């Protein structure tokens, strides 16, 4: 048996021991709860509370915090689950190189967050970002999510919230799944480029056990000359029950599988001289395949003393193979510069905690203490060379065991009717264990390293006066860096971020009418990750500073007319004065929604991404773009013996604008060009005007 196989066995044994330890703690907690229940004076029978829709305001700790309800999600174009993120002020998503089946590129608060390096994503309480990922640190692929199963999206920005840790520098996004459906759904849709989508959602039981089953399939060839052949299949099942009058338990399982072709990044010079069209390709063999299998459990018990014990656990199996070619024939003039990135892992962990509300010295208060545990057991992470998806060499191949243990404490106090304090602290302890699996590779990272960080948080909320609140926020946070770079000494294990913001939210007309918000924020980060074209990965750079302004408005403006709009300005640069590549200065989003009493809902949206520097010396810039989308949903006036029909239409890029998604500047070489290559802008073309319509049966 070789050294690598022994190491993999050892790290798996360690992983199993850690999991057993965590489960033991969870079981002890559950036994404690059961003992409390045994003395609970409340009657033992189970009471099932029906689902109730409410529009009550959630208290927030920052002017930039928000909740996106499902009614806004359903008005987004279908096909890319990440579309919902543009409802967040300043959040832009675009398709990245490598094809539609992989994670999008995310922009927020002056970050090109790549695939999630500085934005933390969650589905319920399970983290989505993947540490030490084969394609990029914090990789967050949202394509396993079925948008119609989402009840709402919680959004926070900045480093001010104790319950969020790794990757929460620019912000955090939590998708909350439904428990049950009021109506079952069967839906079919189709559009240009051979696009098809089919959806089935059912709630077979809605009483003692509330169940949800959903499945969707999606296929498109896209507008490219090299057909995408993108196929995605998702299935999800969830069951929720109340073991006692004060407790709730849910279990969720989901599976995702996708494969696709990609046209890669197009060099501007090849389009300008007619070598290829905007939707052509230099290397048509690019693409990928991926799969997720996820299991999650959640439990909470509400004590008679106004407290809550909560626990959850998750396990995910994940696999990705990605074939790309960024520089074409720069490094290998004969076979080409194709790159293969492979990632195969298990991720598991969970949360334990207790929340208690009450009075502290006569002051309304709430305290939450929790522990978050996570382990990424990566059996194989590989970067290699390939030609037409056939491996030609290996650059680095590793096995990684990366774990974190994160206790946190959160306190909420209201000492005065017009003042709230929300603060806390979290500690994060990481272990990085890397084993080399390739004795002949040019890169052979190996070793073990530990790192810890303490992150204080503080928020002051003043008001409300005349439906207006004022916010002051401060906190520190971090993103972790790739374990391979960490053990090799090339990067700080935990890149510290320090942020602050002040803001105001106001509903001058009250009720469901227009809400206005404005925020000024500031963020320092001591280690930046930037894109490297040669390998299609990221590298660690120096400290950066960002600051900016966000303004927004959302709500009812008159009768059936609603608006959701935002504008952001950001200044971002390295502390030595150089520009941060890809950081946008300006973003804007606006949606006018019309909810007609005849059963028709209409929405027109605009999304704007401003000019971005592509190089640190500011000599090459990516152009800005402005795209309009149209959505129509209409409840058909057809009487059915059971249920109702709804028709829908999405028109993306309504004005058929030529625009660019992911855009980079680096050196590449086409056939017959000089050996040193040519520095140029490379881009993924945005979709042209696209129509998609369908019919849904609700019953």
Describe each model-derived feature in a short phrase.
Residues 354-355, 417-421, 430, 517-524, ...:
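Gram-negative outer-membrane beta-barrel transporters
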Residues 126-157, 176, 491, 533:
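Short acidic/polar hinge/loop motifs at secondary-structure boundaries
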Residues 73, 521, 563, 611, ...:
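C-terminal beta-signal and adjacent terminal beta-strands/loops
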Residues 82, 86-130:
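Extracytoplasmic beta-strand/coil segments of soluble accessory domains associated
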Residues 190-219, 224-263, 287-304, 348, ...:
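Transmembrane beta-barrel wall of Gram-negative outer-membrane proteins
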Residues 298-300, 308-326, 463-475, 493-549, ...:
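Membrane-embedded beta-barrel scaffold of Gram-negative outer-membrane proteins
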Residues 43-79, 101-105, 133:
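N-terminal periplasmic "start-of-domain" segments of outer-membrane beta-barrel proteins
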Residues 154-162, 171-204, 215, 223, ...:
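Short strand-turn segments of transmembrane beta-barrel domains in outer membranes
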């Amino acid at each position: 048996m070789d050294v690598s196989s022994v190491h993999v066995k050892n790290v798996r044994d360690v992983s199993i021991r850690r999991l057993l330890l965590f489960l033991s703690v969870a079981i002890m907690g559950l036994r404690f709860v059961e003992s409390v229940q045994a003395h609970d004076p409340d009657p033992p029978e189970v009471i099932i509370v029906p689902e109730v829709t409410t529009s009550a305001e959630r208290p927030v700790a920052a002017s930039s915090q928000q909740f996106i309800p499902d009614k806004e999600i359903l008005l987004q174009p279908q096909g890319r689950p990440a579309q919902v993120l543009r409802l967040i002020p300043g959040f832009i998503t675009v398709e990245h190189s490598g094809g539609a089946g992989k994670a999008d590129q995310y922009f927020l608060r002056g970050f090109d967050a790549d695939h999630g390096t500085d934005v933390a994503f969650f589905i319920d309480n399970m983290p989505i970002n993947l540490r030490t990922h084969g394609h990029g640190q914090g990789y967050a692929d949202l394509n396993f999510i079925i948008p119609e199963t989402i009840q709402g999206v919680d959004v926070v920005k900045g480093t001010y919230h104790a319950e969020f840790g790794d990757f929460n520098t620019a912000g955090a996004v939590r998708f909350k799944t439904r428990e049950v459906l009021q109506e079952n759904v069967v839906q079919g849709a189709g559009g240009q480029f051979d696009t098809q989508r089919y959806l089935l959602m059912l709630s077979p039981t809605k009483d003692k056990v509330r169940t949800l089953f959903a499945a969707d399939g999606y296929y498109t060839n896209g507008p490219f000359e090299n057909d995408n052949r993108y196929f995605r299949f998702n299935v999800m099942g969830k069951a929720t029950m109340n073991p006692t009058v004060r407790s709730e338990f849910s279990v969720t399982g989901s599976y995702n599988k996708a494969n696709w072709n990609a046209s890669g990044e197009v060099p501007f010079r090849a389009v300008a001289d007619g070598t290829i069209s905007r939707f052509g390709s230099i290397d048509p063999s690019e693409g990928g395949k991926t799969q997720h299998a996820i299991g999650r459990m959640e439990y909470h018990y509400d004590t008679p003393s106004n407290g809550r014990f909560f626990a959850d656990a998750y396990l995910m199996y994940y696999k990705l193979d990605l074939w790309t070619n960024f520089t074409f024939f720069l490094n290998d003039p004969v076979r080409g510069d194709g790159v293969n990135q492979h990632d195969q892992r298990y991720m598991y962990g969970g949360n334990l905690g207790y929340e208690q509300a009450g009075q502290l010295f006569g002051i309304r208060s709430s305290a939450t203490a929790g522990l978050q545990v996570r382990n990424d057991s990566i059996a194989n992470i590989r970067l290699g060379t390939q030609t037409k998806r056939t491996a030609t060499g290996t650059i680095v191949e590793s096995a990684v065991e990366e774990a974190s243990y994160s206790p946190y404490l959160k306190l909420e106090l209201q000492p005065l009717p017009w003042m709230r304090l929300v603060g806390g602290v979290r500690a994060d302890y990481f272990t990085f264990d890397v084993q080399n699996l390739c004795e002949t590779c040019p890169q052979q990272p190996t070793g073990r390293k530990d790192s810890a960080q303490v992150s204080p948080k503080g928020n002051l909320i003043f008001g409300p006066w005349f439906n207006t609140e004022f916010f002051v926020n401060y906190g520190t946070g971090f993103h972790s860096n790739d374990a391979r770079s960490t053990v090799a000494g090339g990067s700080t294990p935990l890149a510290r971020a320090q942020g602050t913001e002040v803001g105001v939210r106001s509903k001058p007309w009250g009720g469901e009418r227009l809400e206005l918000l404005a925020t000024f924020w500031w963020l320092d980060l001591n280690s930046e990750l930037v894109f490297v074209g040669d390998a299609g990965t990221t590298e660690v750079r120096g400290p950066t500073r960002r600051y900016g302004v966000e303004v927004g408005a959302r709500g009812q403006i008159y009768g059936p007319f609603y608006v959701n709009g935002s504008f952001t300005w950001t200044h971002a640069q390295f502390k030595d004065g150089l520009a941060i590549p890809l950081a946008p200065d300006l973003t804007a989003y606006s949606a006018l929604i019309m909810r007609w009493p005849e059963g028709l809902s209409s929405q027109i949206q605009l999304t704007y991404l401003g000019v971005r520097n592509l190089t640190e010396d500011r000599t090459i810039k990516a152009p800005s773009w402005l795209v309009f989308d149209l959505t129509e949903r209409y409840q058909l006036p057809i009487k059915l013996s059971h249920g109702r029909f709804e028709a829908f239409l999405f028109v993306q890029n309504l004005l058929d604008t030529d625009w660019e998604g992911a855009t980079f500047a680096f050196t590449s070489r086409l056939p017959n060009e000089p050996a040193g290559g040519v520095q140029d802008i490379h881009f993924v073309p945005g979709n042209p005007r696209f129509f998609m319509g369908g019919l849904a049966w609700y019953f």
